[in-house]
Amino acid sequence: MTKYKYSVKNLKENQAKALARDASVSFKSAIEACNFLRGRTTKQALSLLEKVLDKKIAIPFKRFTDGVGHRRGNGIAAGRYPQKLSDVLIKLIKNAEANASIKALNENLKIVHLSAQKASVPMHYGRHPRREMKRSHIELIVEEIEEKKKEPKKKKSDVKSTTTTKTKTKSENQKKRESYS
């Protein structure tokens, strides 16, 4: 049996990770969901996945679209509502949040790395040798979002204007127009 390792080698101190090995979910839908959630905060991702479970928001399928029907939504051509995958991803995100709290990180977490790899396909016993059991590994790395400190705004008197504007009166503009004609 081969040993599984994270694809990200060097983990920063403000990052936490979680892994779902041999999850019984489709590899193709896992890739699409990872692309949909990457770059979002964990709170946003959890709320989106809850809406997917309620079938209010579809996960857009952009790469594996063969036979996938059109879904209603902004910018979604094809999409699905993967229920098992949503459950696995919710558990994985909560696991990463727990790992982050153990490392004493605050609750503002952003999903930096979320990827799916194809797992081994076990032999399916029985009379149907063509039936495959779909499994995949899903890894997640979250990073703490540092709050930006607000600087006090500078007053207009402190800022020096580099350009000078010249305003013309109506009479100057009229004289100029008359000289052209």
Q: Positions of the model-derived regions?
A:
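Ribosome large-subunit tunnel/peptidyl-transferase-proximal elements
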Residues: T2-N108, I141-E144
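Low-complexity, rRNA-contacting terminal tracts
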Residues: M1-V25, A98, I102-S181
